[in-house]
């Protein structure tokens, strides 16, 4: 998904996905969580990394579960669980937020890019996607994320917006990309190993 989004934005970076068990900062701020995980991931891999932290914030619950949404996805029924949580509430409005943190390597200050999509929750519909995609309808759409194909979803998703911001920043600060390329030339290894995308 990330490779496709960034390639469509004109920055087809080679990415390698790693599942890592990182200590996670407990905070209501997705930006702070992403930055903290990014520092740990950079130390663990010894190279440049991207880390994504996703939140789903429900208006009726004062913004909860927010970054704690992952704990509602453990049983594969997160969409239905969220809908039942809103029983009795008039508002079904929500927003999805992705915080993508990027670091050039250990010791570097992570850059955090945020994307947000407003929408509302409905009864589960669709089979694509994962987590709560089947219950979230983005503003201006009539279908859930799970009813969209990946190309359509990637044009409007919260993650796409965060990655678009990051891509724009990297184009405007090309010295970061030059440094990564020079590091690669100085340390011969497969280019695919130079970037890591960590998602939890």
Q: What positions do the PLM features span?
A:
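Anionic-ligand binding patches
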Residues: 1-199
């Amino acid at each position: 998904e990330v490779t496709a989004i960034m390639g469509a934005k004109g920055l087809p970076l080679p990415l390698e996905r790693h599942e890592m068990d990182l200590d996670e900062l407990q905070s209501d701020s997705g930006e702070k969580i992403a930055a903290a995980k990014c520092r740990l991931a950079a130390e663990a891999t010894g190279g440049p990394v991207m880390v994504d932290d996703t939140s789903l914030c429900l208006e009726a619950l004062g913004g909860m579960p927010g970054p704690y949404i992952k704990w509602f996805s453990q049983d594969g029924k997160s969409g239905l669980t969220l809908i039942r949580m809103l029983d009795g509430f008039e508002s079904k409005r929500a927003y999805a937020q992705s915080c993508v943190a990027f670091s050039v390597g250990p010791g570097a200050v992570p850059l955090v890019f945020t994307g947000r999509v407003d929408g509302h929750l409905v009864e589960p519909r669709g089979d694509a996607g994962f987590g709560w995609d089947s219950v979230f309808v983005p503003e201006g759409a009539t279908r859930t994320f799970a009813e969209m194909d990946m190309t359509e979803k990637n044009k409007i998703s919260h993650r796409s917006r965060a990655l678009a911001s990051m891509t724009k920043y990297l184009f405007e600060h090309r010295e970061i990309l030059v440094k990564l390329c020079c590091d690669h030339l100085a340390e011969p290894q497969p280019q695919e190993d130079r970037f890591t995308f960590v998602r939890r």
